[in-house]
Swiss-Prot record:
Belongs to the RRM MRD1 family. This is Multiple RNA-binding domain-containing protein 1. Involved in pre-rRNA processing. Required for maintaining steady-state levels of 40S ribosomal subunit. Required for the initial processing of pre-rRNA at the A0 to A2 sites, leading to the processing of the 23S pre-rRNA intermediate to the 18S rRNA. GO terms for biological process: endonucleolytic cleavage in 5'-ETS of tricistronic rRNA transcript (SSU-rRNA, 5.8S rRNA, LSU-rRNA); endonucleolytic cleavage in ITS1 to separate SSU-rRNA from 5.8S rRNA and LSU-rRNA from tricistronic rRNA transcript (SSU-rRNA, 5.8S rRNA, LSU-rRNA); endonucleolytic cleavage to generate mature 5'-end of SSU-rRNA from (SSU-rRNA, 5.8S rRNA, LSU-rRNA); maturation of SSU-rRNA; nuclear mRNA surveillance; poly(A)+ mRNA export from nucleus; small-subunit processome assembly. The modification Phosphoserine is found at S220, S264. Pfam families: RRM_1 (PF00076). Present with 2220 molecules/cell in log phase SD medium. Residues 264-276, 316-325 have a biased composition (Basic and acidic residues). The gene is MRD1. It comes from Saccharomyces cerevisiae (strain ATCC 204508 / S288c) (Baker's yeast).
Length: 887
């Protein structure tokens, strides 16, 4: 937490006045820093809260870059006065803190949300009840439709042809025809029955007086009959009475009348059938003959059923359309944000400090998971931050966790606002597009795409062999054909010596420009590389500094461009990382002249001093060219020149050697944020300073990182110098902590400085990665130019072929060290030589026997362990202390 809240401010106080008041303490605390205004830079945000009218609410917030300054401000200013107002200072809380009271606006918003949810539930319950009533109503209507056969027939007929198959249509037509025939028969029978009932009624009226004792079978015993009966019911009763009357009681005339009516109906049907078969009859006449009168009650029933069927279909369609909308629940903004982050794995950061670096956000977000990219948006014209950044995780789940934990949290004194970021645009070709290209083009594009993730950790100062020979030939005034003789067996050695000479010149030039070459050998991971520094390699000899500048300038402003006079390698530093990344991506493996450019990111903090005026590419200084030598020397002059360089470097080296043990000073109560560089800057001004080191330990939470242990050591040449430093620096303040100094009992330097241990090194070195084609003569000629050799041995196999390494022993250890320094990074027959110090030969026979015994025990133990692993079973193996040392 690096943000504080200040209460009880005067009404008239402004933001600038509040900043100035709290800056005084920072200037007093960081008084040892020489840069004026470093205190104000540590305050990142000042804000006094005001109401709608612009009146001060008498409290405000102040943000600090680090937590130590924020806690110090709370302790120093709490209970103090600004003019006549007593202020109260405490640590501010973030929005995610549960102790923060909920504002009234948020309470009203939540109450409204609960009211809407309750209203929605009531509406859903009402719709459910209404739907249930409609379903019951529809089920009753369906039952009525199933009972009415004529309505079913009508609905089947009115179905569209797309819903009825051909065989179903034939069956329906046949059933319709059968139904029509059946209906005609029923109509004819009903008509005959009505005539019969009419005749019987006449007969009954005529025979009331004549036959009073007429017996009617199965007569009803009801004493009363309904008065208001319908006409249809009378016909039904008449039909029932017709069945009850005995046929034997009818007269012959009546029976004949009935038979005549039946015959007439049959004739009418026969006439209709003949009319249908007559070809001369028109379709209209036939249709008129087939018409059947429908009662008004039946017509109304059919209309209602058809209208209901149409409404039912429309309601079903409407339900299908409305159902998906009701099924999808409304998601909150938080859920939508998490869903988008799960898809992209990218976060958008707002309200960040304008001076924040990418390393700050890497430290903040790396605990949540592995980061793929951190990008701070910069203005290409000014190089300043725009106030927002992007963080891309390899796993989207880690991005969600970071969003939940860090959103609206305090970072560098500001409230960090995190939003889901859009997916990063990629212009990469897919596999389908690559397949349509030539194979050579495919390999080129794939290599270019992998350039940003590829690192060259094997040789940072790699140089093109052709450019090396061209540089040496131009320096000696020779042609490359004259420098290297194809028929000479020592051509490979001459080429290696030429490369060593060029590498020596390049190192001298870079060291004069403030480049720390030791950083290049310490590169072990991508985290130790600086995106703004690019090493340019493999360009042909003759390339000028202006040509390289024209290549890199379109991508952004250059801070410096260093190119040695040899013209075989260059270092480019951009002002911002965005421009450097764009240049690295676009120019990797680009064809330039008759070669392909290799790019590599340089190490962090490789420059020990700021850029000079002549390092800027904007200064179009004249090209520095050396005059060629009029007399062409022989190729042996190269060895002589190399010897001169070796002697000069050895003399300079002798001046840096420290004779005798150094004296260490133990420093206690260091700030955990104090680094080796900070400690070095404070003590390097004293005479006799050697090295300063802060003791660290591995960070258990973050793999590959270290934590300060709160103490350190500073080494000086003599004890008198160390005592003088203790008297001057004991009790002073470094990074806000009062340090304590005293002499340490550790006398020998353990800083890893190779120069202080040069006397303990042997004159025997082992040369690894030696080409199998190299002979003992090649190794002898290569190392003979750096000193007097005592022995050269190239071990071989049983078939007389080389084993890939050699032993070279110099007469003096100093000569061996010079040879290792000069041949560092040199190639022999295309292989980079790797050199290390070898163990010296045993002084007496007993020591040699002990070494051989230890070696044999190690081999035996290794073989037994291998047999145990491959045997599949567990065996008991006794290993004593001496054997354990060999593992």
């Amino acid at each position: 937490m690096s943000r504080i809240i200040v209460k009880g401010l005067p009404v008239y106080l402004t933001d600038d006045n509040l900043r100035e008041h709290f800056t005084k303490r920072l200037r007093q605390k960081h008084s040892h820093q020489a840069v004026n205004g470093s205190g104000p830079d540590l305050i990142t945000d000042v804000k006094i809260l005001r109401d709608r009218n612009g009146e001060s609410r008498r409290f405000g917030f102040i943000g600090y870059r680090n937590e130590e300054d924020a806690f110090d401000a709370v302790e120093y200013f709490n209970g103090s006065f600004i003019n006549t107002s007593k202020i109260e200072v405490s640590m501010a809380k973030s929005f995610a803190d549960p102790r923060v009271p909920q504002p009234m606006k948020e309470k009203r918003r939540e109450a409204l949300k609960r009211f809407r949810e309750k209203e929605e539930k009531l509406l859903q319950e009402e719709n459910r009840k209404k739907k249930k009533v409609d379903e019951n109503k529809h089920s009753n209507i369906d039952d009525e439709i199933r009972k009415n056969k004529q309505l079913q027939e009508f609905m089947e007929t009115m179905k569209p042809s797309s819903q009825v198959t051909s065989w179903e249509k034939v069956g329906i037509d046949k059933s319709i025809e059968d139904e029509k025939l059946k209906r005609e028969e029923e109509d004819s029978s009903v008509q005959g029955n009505s005539l019969l009932a009419h005749a019987l009624a006449l007969k009954e009226e005529n025979n009331k007086d004549e036959a009073p004792n007429l017996v009617i079978e199965n007569e009803s015993d009801d004493e009363y009959s309904a008065l208001n009966r319908n006409r249809d019911e009378d016909q039904e009763d008449a039909g029932e009475e017709e069945k009850m009357i005995s046929i034997s009681n009818l007269k012959d005339t009546d029976i004949g009348l009935v038979n005549d009516d039946a015959n007439s109906d049959e004739k009418e049907n026969e006439k209709r059938r003949n009319l249908a078969q007559d070809e001369k009859v028109s379709d209209l006449d036939w249709f008129k003959q087939r018409r059947v009168r429908i009662k008004e009650s039946e017509a109304e029933t059919r209309e209602k059923s058809s209208s209901y069927a149409t409404e039912q279909n429309e309601s079903l369609d409407t339900k299908k359309e409305e159902q998906p909308e009701r099924a999808v629940p409304q998601k909150t903004d938080e859920e939508l944000a998490i869903e988008k982050i799960n898809q992209t794995g990218r976060l958008f950061l707002r309200n960040i400090l304008y001076t924040s670096k990418e390393e700050d956000f890497r430290k903040l977000f790396s605990p949540f998971g592995e980061l793929e990219e951190v990008h701070v948006a910069l203005d290409t014209r000014t190089g300043q931050s725009k106030g927002f950044a992007y963080v891309l995780f390899k796993d989207s789940k880690n991005a969600v966790n970071a969003y939940v934990e860090l959103d609206k949290q305090i970072f560098q004194g500001r409230l960090l606002h995190i939003l889901p970021g859009e997916e990063k645009k990629s212009h990469r070709l897919d596999e389908f597009d690559l397949k349509n290209m030539p194979l050579k083009k495919q390999k080129e594009l794939k290599r270019k795409a992998a350039a940003s993730r590829q690192t060259f950790s094997w040789n940072s100062l790699y140089m093109n062999q052709d450019a090396v020979l061209g540089s040496v030939a131009a320096k000696l005034g020779l042609e490359k054909s004259q420098l290297i003789d194809a028929e000479n067996s020592s051509s490979a050695v001459k080429q290696a010596l030429a490369e060593a000479h060029v590498i020596g010149d390049v190192r001298k030039y870079f060291e004069s420009k403030g480049v720390d070459l030791t950083k290049f050998s310490q590169l072990k991971s991508t985290n130790q590389r600086d995106d703004k520094v690019i090493l340019v390699k493999n360009f042909p000899f003759g390339t000028t500094r202006e040509e390289l500048g024209e290549m890199f300038l379109p991508y952004g402003k250059l801070e410096r461009l260093l190119m040695p006079p040899a013209g075989t390698i260059a270092i480019v530093q951009f002002r911002d990382t965005t421009s450097a990344r764009a240049a690295f991506t676009k120019l990797s493996y680009k064809r330039f002249k008759d070669g392909i450019i290799y790019l590599e990111r340089g190490p962090k903090d490789c420059f020990t001093k700021p850029a000079e005026a002549d390092d800027l590419i904007n200064n179009t200084s004249a090209k520095e060219e050396e005059n060629p030598v009029e007399v062409k020397p022989s190729s042996n002059d190269l060895m002589e020149a190399n010897k001169d360089v070796t002697e000069g470097s050895s003399n300079a080296h002798d001046e840096d050697v420290i004779d005798g043990p150094t004296v260490s000073i133990f420093i206690k109560n260091l700030n955990f944020s104090t680094t080796n560089q900070n400690l070095t800057d404070r003590f390097k001004v004293f005479t006799g300073f050697v090295v300063a080191q802060v003791k660290t330990k591995p960070d258990p939470k973050h793999q590959g990182k270290t934590l300060s242990m709160g103490f350190g050591f500073v080494e000086f040449r003599t004890k008198e110098q160390a005592n003088a430093v203790i008297a001057a620096m004991d009790g002073t303040v470094i990074d806000g902590h009062k340090i304590q100094l005293k002499l340490s009992h550790r006398q020998a330097s353990q800083s890893g400085n190779t120069k202080t241990k040069s006397n303990k090194k042997s004159g025997k070195i082992i040369v690894k990665n030696l080409p199998f084609e190299a002979t003992r003569k090649d190794v002898f000629e290569l190392f003979n130019s750096f000193g007097q050799l005592k022995s050269v041995r190239v071990p071989k196999k049983f078939d007389k072929s080389a084993r890939g390494f050699a032993f070279v022993e110099f007469l003096l250890p100093k000569e061996a060290e010079n040879a290792m320094d000069q041949l560092h990074g040199v190639h022999l027959l295309g292989r980079r030589l790797v050199m290390q110090y070898a163990e010296e030969d045993a002084v007496d026979a007993e020591e040699e026997i002990a070494r051989m015994t230890k070696k044999v025990r190690k081999q035996v133990a290794t073989n037994e362990m291998a047999a145990l692993r491959n045997g599949g079973g567990r065996k008991k193996l006794d290993v004593d202390d001496e054997e354990n040392e060999g593992f």
